[in-house]
Amino acid sequence: MRPFSGSDCLKPVTEGINRAFGAKEPWQVATITATTVLGGVWLWTVICQDENLYIRGKRQFFKFAKKIPAVRRQVETELAKAKNDFETEIKKSNAHLTYSETLPEKGLSKEEILRLVDEHLKTGHYNWRDGRVSGAVYGYKPDLVELVTEVYGKASYTNPLHADLFPGVCKMEAEVVRMACNLFHGNSASCGTMTTGGTESIVMAMKAYRDFAREYKGITRPNIVVPKTVHAAFDKGGQYFNIHVRSVDVDPETYEVDIKKFKRAINRNTILLVGSAPNFPYGTIDDIEAIAALGVKYDIPVHVDACLGSFVVALVRNAGYKLRPFDFEVKGVTSISADTHKYGFAPKGSSVILYSDKKYKDHQFTVTTDWPGGVYGSPTVNGSRAGGIIAACWATMMSFGYDGYLEATKRIVDTARYIERGVRDIDGIFIFGKPATSVIALGSNVFDIFRLSDSLCKLGWNLNALQFPSGIHLCVTDMHTQPGVADKFIADVRSCTAEIMKDPGQPVVGKMALYGMAQSIPDRSVIGEVTRLFLHSMYYTPSQK
């Protein structure tokens, strides 16, 4: 008896194919085969893209709809109106200033330049010095400004790209990184670099993990898994480096990422898991220990974004407040981003990206070995970097010292908790989740919360507007720890809310109405176009068309 072979299983299939194509010409067989293969490849491409069919279909629908003449004219009319509104606001803000669109024929004197600088710095609609602004300016001490101004002046010409010329500046950067590593419980293997801000810290981490995964795991279609509340810089990094960002819903009660959904979002192309400490919208901290455990289980690096939390989140437990572990003391955490220009109180333009091991930092670097100009390497996005900013950051940290930062942390978090207690019992509003450090986010189930924002704005307060769901938040800084500021905020929130509650059904009007309207527009590309027009308006000059 003939032994059974694999070809016996295929025989019915081959015979069926031969019967189906037996009466066809060779060119027909080739055409059908090619069409079937190409059709299968196309179908696979359509189904297996990073975005699901619903999102892609919705985008294509709106793209087609905007080509309809009547729709296109309406969109163009609204965009033109938005452009005019933005430019009108800029003109109004700078009405008392003269625009310089060409170089002065002869250079201006020191006195004239300083006079013009003072004029420019006096513009603005809010008094940040009196603690009326959410975030933005995290601390202001004249003696510290005097110190960093002098330090920056001494180091303004330096550039760590030229390490042989300015080794002292390189040493300062190394010390800033090491001091930050120690604050976040890094060991002797921890390392990192300074950057120009939180966004660069985040995108550098994404670049490092993309390259690391490509070299050691062969991943060429990378994705990262993040909470929906994570900073928009991760979306920017995704656009820059062709990394798909998989956003996961947060729990509607805690406003921390839903760990079960987070786990389901991980796949074989995931190169990074991300958590916030805290997130920008609500000031809550994700369960970093749970995220890190997933990282260990699936051998995926874990990044903690502490850009907003900065040195406050690093020291809040030492200041007497309870907080779950979130930094390098958690097994599985491989990197942390933190802004020294926020609660490190350094001048704007300084942040750090920290790694648990140099094997990750190594992939952050860009190295070109075959350039005719020589072997070229740079640690961050910029080649030339401002040594003056590095020196000023270093000087700020040396000036504050550990005790100074601990005292500032206690002041800020004490004030934030005081404000939280004061507004939590106000009828008509609620607080999103449990604020972990300095951000307090307010919402309402009774009235449009943007009415409260508008009322507070008229009293001189400048808060951040949130969407999906609607909310506003106050990011408490050292400016709010000044005597009377917290009490004034609580009193104004209470009185404004009481007035709104007399007629809670009234719609919001004025500028804040735009935020509510923006959320209701299903075609988010239109909102994107409006945002681009706003960004263009920031560069307005009278002669520009």
From Swiss-Prot:
What EC number is given for this enzyme? 4.1.2.27
Q: Which reaction does it catalyse?
A: sphinganine 1-phosphate = hexadecanal + phosphoethanolamine
Tissues/organs with expression:
Localized to the developing gut primordium during embryogenesis.
GO CC aspect terms? endoplasmic reticulum; endoplasmic reticulum membrane; membrane
SUPFAM superfamilies, sorted: PLP-dependent transferases
Q: What is its main location?
A: endoplasmic reticulum
List locations, semicolon-separated.
Endoplasmic reticulum membrane
| Record annotation: effect of changing S335I | Loss of function in sphingolipid catabolic process
The disruption phenotype is: Flies lacking Sply display decreased viability associated with altered nephrocytes morphology. Altered lipid metabolism with accumulation of sphingosine-1-phosphate upstream intermediates is observed.
**Which residue spans belong to the Lumenal compartment?**
1-26
Task: Name the keywords, alphabetized.
Answer: Developmental protein, Endoplasmic reticulum, Lipid metabolism, Lyase, Membrane, Pyridoxal phosphate, Signal-anchor, Sphingolipid metabolism, Transmembrane, Transmembrane helix
Q: Which CDD domains match?
A: DOPA_deC_like
Q: How does it sit in the membrane?
A: Single-pass type III membrane protein
Q: What does this protein do?
A: Cleaves phosphorylated sphingoid bases (PSBs), such as sphingosine-1-phosphate, into fatty aldehydes and phosphoethanolamine. Sphingolipid catabolism is required for normal development including viability, reproduction and muscle development.
Q: Any idea what this protein is called?
A: Sphingosine-1-phosphate lyase
